[in-house]
Amino acid sequence: MTQNPYDPLKRTDLSHREQVLLKFTAEVVHGTNLALIDTLVAPDYVQHTHGVGQGREGIRRYVTEISMRRAGREQWRPLLVFEDGDFVILYKLLPAFMIVDIVRFNAEDQLAEHWDIVQPLPAPGHDPMELSQHDFSRFYALFGVPRQG
């Protein structure tokens, strides 16, 4: 795997909210510590991920019914995390997917609102830190653009 100069696990300057999101992701989403939901997540948590319910109970149900039963759930690594105002963005790699989580925090530093983007890896063993090469094949297929020439 290509060295990641932005690796959140090696950074010493993480903000409090970046640390909270990493803890939540590691211990709740990819772990088994459901008790953290009651302290790290706002009671009126808003979920924008289609199919996942609202509030703490929505997260709890997703983790117990889906996340805890997902193959390879513990095999993940954060690639990038950054804070901008009330938002923290986490880019992470799983065995078959890349995911971007966008989280808004409330004044109590709890997760208050969530969006995500899930993308299958373009190829098995894909290294997202490796420099890209010119090959539009996946874009032709993804966007339905006819090839020229």
Which residues does each predicted region cover?
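C-terminal and inter-domain tail/linker signature
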Residues: M1-G149
